[in-house]
A protein has these predicted regions:
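Long, solvent-exposed, polar/charged low-complexity segments
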Residues: 1-15, 44, 151-222
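Active-site acidic/histidine clusters and adjacent loop/turn architecture
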Residues: 14-67
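Inter-helical turn/loop segments and adjacent helix faces that build the functional surface
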Residues: 20-27, 121, 125, 192
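Long, hydrophobic, amphipathic alpha-helical segments used as structural scaffolds
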Residues: 47, 51, 55, 142, ...
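A short, surface-exposed loop/turn module that caps and links secondary-structure elements
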Residues: 53-80, 84, 149-162
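Aromatic- and glycine-enriched beta-alpha-beta binding-site module
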Residues: 72-132
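Compact, glycine/acidic-enriched structural inserts
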Residues: 106-164
């Protein structure tokens, strides 16, 4: 059961940033396991179990990131990631091109939300076509998002706007990649078991957005 991260979690992430090498990591591996790896896996398991109970008609697929970077893609970085995350999807048959729910912790902050890790150009073109064909479903979702203060629309914009469906949907329409995120500084919630409930509530709020985006990717594959 998740009981919260700790100051030691943040200390480890900062120290790893400045000592990102195998000898240091091996010397501090038990600290990693105790303060980051096991709490992350416990949080992910608790959130997944709660979502399965709350939404029994859905199948949830969990992935917890490993601390080890792909040795083929270091590009001058150290062998270990300086952040850690987990993702949840309702479809295991496709990869990171479909949206996912996520939680991530870094030395600076933590975040959770839902969106694309990356999105193909065809996916976003299909997204724009869906808006053009019927803007009302996304209009309702955009208004719902604007009526709360936990999640915000983020993600890289196209350098040149793809179109203008009106002030409300313009920020959505012109995203190269789309994310609904909540970013917080390290606070009491991070160090509390109440984080589990916060994620479950947040992911529940984001489910209609996930369904909308996931349906877009299915239309693209059709």
């Amino acid at each position: 059961m998740f009981t919260g991260f700790s100051d030691a979690t943040i200390d480890f992430l900062w120290e790893l940033r400045f000592h990102n090498e195998r000898p240091w990591f091996l010397e501090h591996k038990q600290v990693f396991l105790d303060t980051l790896d096991r709490p992350m896996k416990a949080l992910a398991a608790d959130v997944t179990a709660a979502l399965e109970q709350a939404y029994p008609d859905r199948k949830w697929y969990l992935h917890v990131a490993r601390i080890y970077r792909d040795a083929r893609r270091l590009h001058g970085n150290g062998p270990y990631k300086e952040n850690l995350w987990f993702t949840l999807r309702c479809d295991s048959s496709r990869g990171p091109e479909i949206p996912a729910f996520y939680f991530e912790i870094t030395p600076h902050n933590y975040s959770y939300g839902m969106g694309f890790y990356w999105a193909k150009a065809n996916t976003m073109a299909c997204f724009r076509r869906a808006i053009d064909a019927d803007p009302l479903p996304l209009t309702a979702l955009a208004e719902r998002l604007n009526a709360q203060d936990t999640f915000v629309l983020t993600g890289q914009d196209y350098a040149r706007a793809k179109g203008d469906p009106g002030a409300l949907l313009h920020p959505w329409y012109n995203k190269r990649v789309l994310d609904l995120s909540c970013v917080r500084e390290h606070d009491d919630l991070l160090f509390s078991p109440a984080l589990t409930d916060a994620l479950v509530r947040g992911f529940g709020f984001l489910l209609p957005y996930y369904d909308y985006l996931e349906a877009v990717t299915r239309r693209e594959d059709a």
